[in-house]
A protein has these predicted regions:
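A domain-start/cap signature at the N-terminus of enzymes
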Residues: 1-5
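Short alpha-helix in the alpha/beta-hydrolase fold that links the catalytic acid
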Residues: 161-171
């Protein structure tokens, strides 16, 4: 699990990287929760998602947004963090220009950043959005959403009411050419305490199904 330092728009970016031997292996970028509320690339769900994607055959990277850990810079309310994510994806794409799939997976604040990255990078073929803060951030930029993906949310989320995520899912599901999958975890809070294994299994099942589909699951 190499500890790497990448060049970023605000200076160095601290990251972890696990590769696959196949040059066209699928790749995945994992985005952590809000930096000002304890979010780092070492949060348990980020860490476990990183390893689960690698188990599924992906070259995978997780990293600290600016101002977190050894990443330089300071919190930038999303704009700078999106630039950080784009810089890391640039690095991945330079090393692996022809992946069979390209995933972006984000948790909470990271889900918002991931969906913005999805709009800007046509090479991203699938997304996983876990506990997206649909009550705090505007997702209207997903017009249209360019790829199919998975939303996972807890019914007892104390930060983001499940009804707000349902509205987002309903809006995206009405768009043509994509398929939105939404899984609610009964009793789970925003941090999925005591439910993280269930989240990982849901993501694994979805990713495996998408990558096995002859049409990419779109």
């Amino acid at each position: 699990m190499p500890d790497i330092i990448l060049p970023g728009p605000a200076g160095r970016i601290e990251a972890r990287y696990q590769r696959q031997k196949a040059p066209n292996a699928p790749m995945a970028l994992i985005l952590h929760p809000h930096p000002q509320y304890g979010g780092t690339m070492n949060n348990p769900l980020v860490y476990d998602l990183y390893h689960r994607y690698h188990k599924l055959g992906c070259t995978v990277v997780r990293f600290n947004f600016r101002g977190v850990g050894r990443s330089q810079g300071s919190f930038d309310n999303g704009a700078g963090e999106l630039s950080d994510a784009a810089a890391v994806l640039d690095w991945m794409s330079t090393l692996y220009p022809n992946p069979s799939y390209c995933w972006v997976a984000g948790i909470s604040f990271g889900a918002w950043i991931g969906m913005q990255l999805l709009m800007r990078r046509p090479e991203i073929t699938g997304f996983v959005s876990i506990a997206p803060q649909a009550n705090l951030y505007d997702f209207a930029f997903l017009a249209p959403c360019p790829a199919s993906g998975l939303f996972v949310h807890g019914t007892k989320d104390q930060v983001v009411p499940e009804a707000d995520v349902q509205k987002l899912v309903d809006r995206l599901s009405a768009q043509k050419g994509i398929k939105i999958t939404y899984v609610k975890i009964d009793g789970a809070n925003h941090f999925f305490d005591n439910h993280q294994p269930e989240v990982l299994d849901i993501v694994e099942d979805y990713v495996k199904r998408r990558m096995a589909s002859t049409d990419g699951g779109r």
